[in-house]
Amino acid sequence: MKSYKKILPLFSIALLVILLYFSDLPSVVDVLLKTNMFLISIALVILVASVFIRIVRWKLFLKNLNIDSTWGECSYSYMPALFLSNFTPARVGEPIRSYFLKKMKGVSMSKTIPSVIVERAMDVISLVILGVFILFTFNLGYIVYVDVFLIILVIIIGIALLRNERVAGRIFGVFFRIFSFHPRLKDAKRRREEITERFHSGFRIKKSILSVVFILSLLIWVSEGIIFYLAFLSIGVELSLFLITSIFAFSILMGVITFLPGGIGSTEFVFALILSSYIPLSQATAGIILGRFLTFWIIMFIASFFWRKV
């Protein structure tokens, strides 16, 4: 397992090195030096709005659970989890925000984890909606269609199973048996029915809130698509917003499928591969570097400050 964790970051670095090599690094640097900083500043404003929408979405989930949380509590439970989860494959570390919330308010993790699961499902569905259009532009092979279909199928089946209290109880039963050696889980095993009920209640989301959350999820990813559009525009590349957003969403999905931490390497590689059909690879890579810096690395930088204070 440890060797597996070491290989993934190395694979990410290797993909980035290969991309930069074939993009002609001096040409990429030359393109980046001509960046229009005014457009980048507009992108930063949109980025701040995108982060705020993420926190609003989390607050809505907590409101659905009748958890009275301040904006500070929402931020300090969400942002550190975002920072840590980006180091995990497919951001599977997201549920740690439930731990941070428990640490601050004493709220049971089993009560809030379902909201995190639904939120991640909304993200993936939003990305599929935005990214599916690019599939019809290129003959990307049947395996891509199969992967996207399997992602949606797993999400639907997974949520359907977890919403079933009996199934959830059995899953917890297996979990507690496997990890019964842990002293804290021994106590939790005795409260399995109580934990299962809390977990199951977390999936009872009002339709009105679920609809708003879905719209917010779409808005988050569209705003990040706009940031990429501005990044390309800032280096003199004029492509349609629709095209950039669709390729961006599809690339993020492919990054999730590869299970590389934060999708680093795989997202950029797929993005550049598709975009090189429209513009020179050096311009594609330069725009992607700018876009990823704005939508990923700056968010990581901001989130790290919240992490230090938790």
Regions of interest found by a model, annotated:
Residues 55-78, 231-247:
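Membrane-embedded helical hairpins/re-entrant loop segments and their flanking transmembrane helices
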Residues 189-234:
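Alpha-helical transmembrane segments and their immediate interhelical loop/hinge regions
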